[in-house]
């Protein structure tokens, strides 16, 4: 069974429907005590980093997610959910994250971008240049759907995917049993569905 974490910040319905499409027994979970009963966790998210961390803390879900990650079972963060995996974010101030992957979340550096060609937020289809990973089984450099104004900065050893938007940025990460994915697989048609299928087999 797969738990989709509900902390009042997620694109829950679309992630749930994508799981249902591939025949996965997924449940939207808001009770942190239940998380340990699942085999995999999806941490979705849409919105501001600081608000998301506040919700995770206030609901008790932060500790539940950290405990789940420590158990060694697979967990994936999607979009804002991926950013929460890192140590900190500079979005609207300085905020601490879950600290599951070393690194931080920063705004797109507009000084490196042609702003006539590259608007922020980064919205739409773009190519993810992937390294070999179980998450990308059968896929090579897939086009996926993005919506974000911030991106992660981390050590190269954790990066399994990069995307170019004015400059190269980190769009997929992996550390042990923990995966992060900046684009939205649930909005990325066949390529995104394949990535969700691959996660279910990890």
Descriptions of predicted regions:
Residues 151-202:
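C-terminal and late-domain segments of enzyme folds
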Residues 42-44:
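Structural motif
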Residues 47-122:
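Cysteine-nucleophile active-site neighborhood
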Residues 2-24, 185-187:
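N-terminal beta1-alpha1 ligand-phosphate binding loop
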């Amino acid at each position: 069974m797969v738990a989709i974490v509900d902390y009042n910040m997620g694109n829950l319905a679309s992630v749930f429907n994508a799981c249902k499409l591939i025949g996965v027994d997924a449940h939207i979970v808001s009770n942190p005590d239940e998380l340990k009963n699942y085999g995999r966790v999806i941490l979705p998210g849409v919105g501001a980093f600081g608000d998301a961390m506040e919700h995770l803390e206030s609901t008790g879900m932060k500790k539940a997610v950290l405990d789940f990650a420590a158990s060694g079972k697979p967990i994936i963060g999607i979009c804002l959910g991926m950013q929460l995996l890192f140590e900190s974010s500079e979005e609207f101030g300085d905020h601490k994250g879950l600290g599951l992957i070393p690194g931080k979340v920063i705004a797109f550096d507009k000084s490196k971008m042609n702003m006539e060609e590259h608007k922020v937020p980064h919205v739409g289809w773009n190519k993810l240049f992937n390294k070999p990973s179980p998450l990308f089984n059968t896929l090579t450099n897939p086009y996926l759907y993005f919506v974000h104004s911030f991106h992660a900065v981390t050590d190269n050893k954790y990066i399994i995917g990069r995307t170019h938007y004015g400059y190269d940025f980190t769009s997929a990460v992996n550390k042990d049993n923990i995966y992060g994915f900046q684009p939205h697989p649930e909005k990325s048609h066949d390529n995104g569905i394949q990535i969700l299928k691959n996660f279910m087999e990890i």
